[in-house]
């Protein structure tokens, strides 16, 4: 087994090691998608192209399941996913829009509390 740690694993909790495991799995799934994508891009055989694209889609599914696990289990993922995934318009402007929406919600909450 390769050493996936940059810090001593013995100093990490079980949960922290599970998060490292998930992140490494996610990296492997994304790498597999990349490899299949490249193979699909260069093959001339239609049937082989379809098979490899099917394989790539399976790897994408695995990556998404791992992302969902990370969202549920490591702080930070949920907020970032809510900001950037499925947003409309310019992706770079999504953060600013999210901040504005948060400020509006904070104002509403303050009004409710003051009543």
Predicted regions and their residues:
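Iron-associated oxidoreductase/ferritin-like identity signal
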Residues: 1-115
